[in-house]
């Protein structure tokens, strides 16, 4: 089941990482790889603006540095929705087309599965800024497929890992 931190998964499991181009998202990719995932990346563009194009270029450059495949998703049609809801809708659609079970992001939040098998969102335990509120609008179906690899790490730990990973 999806989780946090350095849990381990079967080698054949695949995950589609929402890549922003930030060092933090690069660290999340490396953590997923260390957990045994085959990682592909996607950058979601919600508008046709210079800022969105620059962010997409940064994400593609990071993916190249990480040696992961990166696809660009044009999700302008979803731009009227909540930003995170739109981004994850685009990620899940792409994951389904690619036959990938999980999606991931570099948000500071944690996922846990309760005794009934329901995936629930929680704040990070690490003292990192709580970004679970940004994901609160996601449906249970999305949460069941979501992995948040940074949920157990403080920003200082992520910065140290970025140095170790030469990001």
Predicted regions and their residues:
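ATP-dependent adenylation/nucleotidyltransferase module used to activate substrates
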Residues: 1-138, 147, 155-158, 163-164
């Amino acid at each position: 089941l999806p989780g946090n931190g350095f849990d381990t998964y079967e080698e054949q499991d695949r995950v589609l990482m929402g890549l922003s181009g930030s060092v933090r998202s690069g660290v999340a990719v490396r953590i997923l790889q260390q957990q045994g995932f085959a990682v592909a990346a996607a950058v979601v563009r919600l508008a046709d603006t210079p800022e969105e194009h620059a962010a997409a270029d940064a994400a593609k450059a990071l993916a190249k540095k990480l040696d992961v495949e990166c696809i660009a998703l044009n999700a302008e049609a979803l731009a009227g929705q909540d930003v995170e809801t739109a981004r994850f809708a685009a990620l899940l659609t792409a994951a389904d087309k690619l036959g990938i079970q999980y999606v991931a992001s570099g948000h500071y939040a944690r996922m846990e599965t309760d005794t009934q098998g329901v995936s629930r969102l929680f704040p990070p335990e690490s003292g990192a800024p709580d970004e679970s509120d940004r994901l609160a609008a996601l449906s249970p179906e999305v949460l069941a497929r979501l992995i948040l690899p940074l949920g157990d790490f403080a920003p200082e730990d992520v910065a140290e890992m970025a140095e170790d990973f030469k990001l």
